[in-house]
Amino acid sequence: MRIACRPSRIYYIHNFIWIMTEEQAFDLLTRVMYETRKNKRYGGDSVAFEWCWSRKLVRMFDALMTKEFRVDNNYAFLTSYPKWREIFATSFEGRIADHLVCDLLRPYIELELHPRTFNNRVDKGSQAAINQVIEDIAEVTNGYHDDARVIKWDLKGFFPNAWCSHMEICFNEVIEKYRQDIAAEYGDDIPGFLRWLAMICIHCNASNNCELRTPQGLWADHIEPEKSLFSKEPGIGVPIGRLTSQTGMGLYINDDVRWLNDDCGIHTTVFMDDGVMVVPEWQHEYALSLIPELRKRLEAKGVRLNDKKFYDQPWRNGLEFLGTHINPWRLHLNDKTYNRAIERIREFNAIEDKYRFIEKFKATVNSYTGLLKNRTEYRRICVLRDAIAPEWWEWLEWDNRRQCIVSKPDYSFCMLLNRKYNLKLKQHDKSRNHRAH
C-alpha cells in the first residue's frame, strides 16, 4: 500500500537535518508497526489504530521528529489469573514507541545481558529457564548422584519499586557503549534520539495519566499498596505490561546476576523476579552467606527480597519454578494452571453457538496442550482431550502426533473466511510441504 506524498519536509534535530517525505516516513515505521501488532492482532488498540493507520503513522513520525511525542494515553486494569495483579498498558502509538526503542537496541541488549537471564530474550524464555535449572542440577550432582541444594528466591514488588532513573541509566549505558555501532547502522543522530525516546517511555508517569478499566474498589480489596503504582511517588515504579519495562528490568539486575554467576561461581538462573541457585552440598553455607550481600545490592536499587518466598531444600525434594514442578526425572505443570485449562474448556462447552468460536477454542486448547507437551504430562493431555464436548469434533479433529487439535479440511481458517466473506482463498496444500519428505 502506498500513500499520497506531499513535498519533502525538513526536520531539524539539534544540528542534524533529516530530509524525508511522508512516504519515507511511512516506510520507516511500518516495519515496527507490524512487529508491534504481530501478537496482538485482534486487540482493541490494534483494531482502533488501523482506521486511517497510514495517516496516524505519519502523524506519529512528525511528533517523534519534533520531539513532541508523549506516552500519555495509558489505561490500568486488574487481572485475577494466575493471581491478582495490576497491569498498565498504553495506546498503540505508545507500544510502537516501546518497540522502536527495544527493537533497535535488541542486538546490543543481547550482548550486554548475562546468559543466565532468560526473560525477554531472543531464543530464550520460561521453558529455556526451566531447562537451565534441570541442567544445573544434573551438572552439580554429577548425573544425579551427589548431594546438592536448591535455593530459590523472589523479589517483592519488583516493578512497582524500581527506580525510573536507574532504568534510564541502564538503557543509556547500552546506547553509549555501542554508540558507534548504532550510528553506523542507523545514523549519527540516532543514539541521541534513542536516549530521548527511552526517557519518554520510561518516565511516562502512567499512574497519573491513565484510565481505570477495572472498578476502583477492587484495588483496595486485592492489591497491596506496596505493589501498586498509585501509591508510589513520581519516579518510583514502572508499569507491568510495557515492553520497555520488561526489557529494562532485565538490565536492572544484570550486574547482580553477573556477580552471582561469574564472581561468586554460583549456578544462578533468573527469570524476571524469580531466581534459582543450585549449589553442591559442600558449598551450601557459602551460598547462604551471599544472600545478605545480595539483599544489600538489591536494596541499593530500591528492590528487596521476599522473605516469605525463600526456598532452601535438597534437590531430591524438587521445587516449583515458573509454574512447573521440577522433580527428579520428571516435570509437572502446577495444578492451578491445569485446573484453569479444564475450566476454560468447560466454559467453551457451555456455549450454544460453538461454530462462531472454532478458532478461539482451538487456540485456547492448544496453548494448554503446548504447556503440557513440554512436561511429562501425557495422561493429563488425554484427560484434557476427553473434556472437550462431542459437538466440537464436527469441525475439529485430534492430531495424535502433535498432541493438539486441528481443523478439519472443510473448516480451516481459509475456508471459514471464504464462507463468511464469499472469498476464494486457497487452502494449504499438504503435498507441497517439503518438510514432510
What are these model-derived regions, one by one?
Residues 136, 141-272, 277-290, 313, ...:
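Conserved polymerase palm-domain catalytic core
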Residues 1-58, 418-437:
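Non-catalytic, polymerase-adjacent accessory regions of viral genome-replication enzymes
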Residues 72-74, 269-273, 308-310:
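Short Gly/Ser/Thr- and Asp/Glu-enriched loop/turn motifs at secondary-structure junctions
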Residues 2-4, 11-13, 102-163:
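Active-site-proximal segment of RNA-dependent polymerases
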Residues 175, 179, 294-303:
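A common structural junction motif
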Residues 90-91, 95, 99, 218-235, ...:
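Right-hand nucleic-acid polymerase module
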Residues 41-43, 47, 72-96, 112-124, ...:
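Short, conserved non-catalytic motifs in the polymerase core
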Residues 50-73:
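Amphipathic alpha-helical blocks
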